[in-house]
Amino acid sequence: MKKIINNPDQFVDEMVEGILLAHPDQVRTPGDDRRVLVRVDSPAPGRVGIVTGGGSGHLPLFKGYVGKGLCSGVAIGNVFSSPSVQQCADAAKAVDGGAGVLFLYGNYGGDVFNFDLAVDLLELDGIETRTVLGCDDVASQPKERAKDRRGVAGIFFAYKAAGAAAERGDSLDEVAAVAQKVVDNTATMGVGLSPTILPTTGAASFDLPEGEMEIGIGIHGEPGIHRGPLGTADEIADQILDSVIPDLGLGEGDRVAVLVNGLGATPLEELYLLYRRTHQRLEELGVVIERRYIGEYATSLEMAGGSISLLKVDDELLELLDAPAQSPFFREA
């Protein structure tokens, strides 16, 4: 294992400290617990707060999307581990400006359990909440069980749209409805080429022989749907799109936003090869590509591989995607 770290047990805390030192104009800690970060201007009276959270190891997910026009706060867990109930509640309290708080995070058992308990604590304090779960990973469950799918890179679209809705003054129910609309129209699938090495143990998160790939792998190394010889960029994109396109029922005249995401150790050049084939496939179908995002949006430490997310859009969602936003890891002018 080769990593640029100090004490593995302090990996997350030192990383958070680095973010705070590098971006004091955008994020801050509301209290003594540095596992809770909020926008520097939170709380804002009358503005709906949006709180996300989850395990570390996925930057810029989750903590990298705290900022203007995005999330208001984040609860930070250890690597691949859920934040505590108290951290989830503290993040919500710190961003509540009287308009309520939307919890928007990926659909993972530990996160759901702790955030749900935080909702109970917040009710005692009179803070109104709503919850929307990112569940865009089409490999994790069939279409008829879409609400049980894992949340992966496609949650970026929900952050962006819901954050813009909150910024323009929408109510809590309206912001939650925007987030749910995005979730209902987003589909993602990934491919893994090499495992993540956990900083605390030095152990690989899964085994993948040299020369093989795994289609549908999760961002924690959860098993995919197909393992076999490494394909070409076009073959990989086709395998992913053969699941993602029909999942959304895309056809001629439909409009989409495309996100090609790197998982941590994949060169940007290779992501553009995946985008190239994605563009070709959608163009052949007569699907209009309205927006394109290529880069690292949800990683898994140094896992090699990538994912393709498609969001079916309309005029409302495009307006929200184009609204100004700024966080340590994302900017929309």
Predicted features and spans:
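Short, acidic/small-residue loops that bind anionic groups at enzyme active sites
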Residues: V74-V79, E123-D148, E284-I289
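Glycine-rich oxoanion-binding loops at beta->alpha junctions
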Residues: H58, F62, G67-G98, I245
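Short glycine-rich or small-residue beta-strand-to-loop segments that form or flank ligand, phosphate
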Residues: K2, V48-G55, C71-V74, N78, ...
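Short Gly/Thr/Asp-enriched flexible loops that form oxyanion-binding sites at enzyme active sites
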Residues: V112-G126, R145, E270-R276
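Mixed-charge interfacial surface used for oligomerization/domain docking
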Residues: R168-L273
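N-terminal amphipathic/basic leader segments beginning at the initiator methionine
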Residues: M1-I50, D315-A333
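Short alpha-helices
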Residues: L133-N185
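C-terminal non-catalytic interaction/assembly regions of soluble proteins
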Residues: S243-A333
